[in-house]
């Protein structure tokens, strides 16, 4: 759900996730007159629950190993490109057949960089309604300063309800609430969808991330953040509109900067170098394995060296505009949906197109002034790095002044109107060809260039890299079997650990924090900015039990995408909800260190306590506790 995880916590379709996972939907439900992000929200009755604009909840119901079917599509003598195409055609075929047969969203997912392929099938729900959200000041107490740090005091929790045929979904499988939560050294588990890790990548790939991809991403994020902050200063309403974007980019900047700094640490690179040396050493013990697999490490290294210049150019050839994103999405949706599955671009099967249409027709508000700020930041960076004479930007502007061109295509576009987008999609290619909207005309023009560029990328780099990675994965299986877990890929995973503190900054971090610490931190920062407590906290201060545990840390191995994962005990009862990792966890994209890598959770006791004593949401607390 919106890039995060969640769990059913009642028999009536109630889903628990993080506020920072749900805040995009909360913002879409907000207006200048009713800012739900700032004020919070609670629906005491079903009829008061607010339907989200474009939130999907996908529930995994089935998974099947289909490695033999996918690899069987590749025959002897195929080139790397032909092999990649053959596997993609087989994947498209299976996804279409399984979706048609079962009615479920069906995704073929690669594990071990192509070593295994599995079919994952999901029941998808799109009628999802907001039930409860605290005010941002409680959910994100401490702001970006405290993000990815510990100790923490955050009420980063939101509840939605899934509806089926207009009624709350009867969820027979759900987590029950623990009485008493967890204590230090208790065993805990987390089930969620970690987005992606790079632990099985070669040393060459990790060096490429350190030297090229991560610095470029950080630069883009910083440029965008600067533009958003400048825009937000123009008015209170501008600040409200920019807030969610700022939150997302600030979060990304801190996460990616943590990964980058981890890779600049010689100790991290020494660990990765030793892991690869040990692996290669195992291969070298067999002449047969050496002859068959060692060359692929060199192939990855050579491919990345050849790709450096191309990567740089591709990184600065994009238009970071929501309006243009709608336009290109509509052009691609219309073009690809007319083709047989086998002839479509990767990622445009029937199931994907259905989700794509759902997003393209979302009634969520689109703010053109925000879009201009974001778009100009990207354009200015792109032409600053490549110049307006670059072949991509030359096609975009066709001699026009870049800023005037941007203002014109955004101001004169109707794609901020959901009804207009829906009519365009329903009108098919004829509607597109007759459309005078400048964003659509730009998308039709650039689509041809982008398809050619993407094809060159797939044929000359992606297919060859995929071939090498799959061969390295074969060698890893022959030596280690399944003893090493696959990198994260946003499929459901289970991790376990202990509720446990750790040493940091010459002292110790406790296993859990309490409400006492929240007041101390607020007062220490003058009760201002991100450290100002919500009014309700002060109003009820004298009646609260400040010993109530609030947040805690565990040794569970998580990564981005795990946000919203339920934290459960050995009896599969809720003891918390994951909302973050500490600063030491950020290098966990590449290596996991149990001594200091920690997952942060909101304590289940505090969730119930806050609902009853701070938010007058006793009915919701009763539902969670089965009362």
Regions found by a protein language model. Name each.
Residues 1-627:
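Terminal presequence/propeptide segments associated with secretion/organelle targeting
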């Amino acid at each position: 759900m919106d890039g995060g995880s969640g769990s059913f916590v009642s028999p009536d379709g109630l889903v628990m996730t993080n506020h920072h996972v749900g805040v995009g939907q909360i913002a879409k439900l907000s207006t200048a007159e009713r800012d739900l992000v700032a004020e919070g929200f609670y629906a005491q009755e079903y009829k008061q629950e607010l339907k989200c604009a474009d939130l999907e909840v996908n529930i995994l119901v089935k998974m099947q190993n289909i490695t033999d079917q996918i690899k069987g599509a590749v025959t002897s003598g195929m080139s790397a490109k032909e092999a990649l195409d053959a596997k993609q055609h087989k994947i498209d075929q299976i996804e279409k057949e399984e979706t048609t047969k079962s009615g479920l969203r069906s995704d073929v997912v690669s594990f071990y960089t192509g070593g295994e392929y599995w079919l994952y099938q999901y029941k998808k729900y799109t009628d999802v309604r907001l039930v409860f959200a605290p005010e941002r000041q409680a959910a994100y107490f401490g702001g970006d300063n405290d993000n990815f740090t510990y100790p923490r005091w955050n009420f980063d929790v939101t509840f939605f309800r899934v509806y089926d045929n207009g009624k709350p979904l009867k969820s027979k499988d759900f987590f029950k609430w623990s009485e008493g939560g967890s204590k230090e050294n208790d065993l805990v588990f987390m089930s969620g969808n970690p987005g992606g890790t790079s632990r099985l990548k070669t040393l060459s790939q990790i060096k490429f991330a350190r030297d090229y991809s991560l610095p470029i991403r950080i630069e883009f994020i910083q440029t965008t953040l600067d533009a958003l902050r400048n825009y937000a200063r123009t008015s209170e309403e501008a600040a409200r509109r920019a807030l969610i974007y700022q939150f997302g980019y600030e979060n990304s900047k801190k996460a990616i900067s943590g990964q980058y700094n981890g890779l600049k640490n010689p100790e991290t690179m020494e660990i990765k170098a030793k892991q690869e040396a040990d692996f290669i050493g195992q291969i070298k013990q067999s002449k047969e394995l050496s002859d068959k697999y060692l060359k692929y490490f060199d192939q990855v290294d050579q491919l990345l060296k050849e790709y450096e210049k191309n990567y740089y150019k591709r990184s600065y050839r994009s238009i970071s505009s929501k309006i243009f994103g709608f336009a290109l999405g509509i052009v691609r949706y219309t073009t690809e949906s007319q083709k047989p599955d086998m002839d479509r671009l990767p990622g445009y099967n029937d199931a994907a197109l259905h989700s794509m249409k759902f997003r393209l027709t979302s009634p969520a508000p689109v703010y053109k002034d925000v879009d201009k700020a974001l778009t100009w930041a990207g354009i200015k960076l792109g032409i600053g790095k490549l110049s307006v004479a670059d072949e991509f930007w030359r096609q975009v502007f066709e001699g026009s002044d870049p800023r005037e061109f941007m203002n014109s295509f955004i101001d004169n576009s109707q794609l901020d109107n959901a009804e207009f987008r829906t009519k365009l999609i329903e009108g098919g290619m004829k509607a597109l060809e007759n459309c005078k909207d400048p964003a659509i005309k730009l998308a039709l023009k650039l689509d041809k260039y982008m398809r050619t560029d993407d094809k060159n990328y797939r044929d000359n780099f992606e297919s060859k890299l995929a071939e090498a990675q799959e061969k390295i994965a074969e060698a890893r299986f022959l030596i280690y079997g399944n003893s090493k877990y696959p990198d994260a890929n946003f499929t459901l995973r289970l991790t376990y650990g202990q509720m446990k503190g750790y040493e940091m900054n010459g002292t110790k971090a406790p296993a859990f924090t309490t409400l006492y610490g929240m007041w101390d931190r607020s007062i220490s920062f003058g009760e201002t900015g991100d450290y100002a407590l919500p009014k309700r906290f002060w109003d009820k201060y004298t009646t609260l039990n400040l010993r109530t545990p609030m947040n805690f840390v565990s040794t569970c191995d998580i990564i981005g995408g795990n946000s919203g994962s339920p934290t459960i005990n050995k009896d599969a009862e809720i003891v918390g909800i994951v909302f973050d990792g500490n600063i030491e966890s950020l290098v966990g994209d590449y290596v996991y260190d149990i001594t200091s890598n920690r997952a942060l959770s909101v304590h289940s006791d505090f969730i119930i306590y806050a609902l009853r004593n701070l938010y007058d949401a006793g009915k919701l607390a009763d539902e969670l506790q089965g009362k």
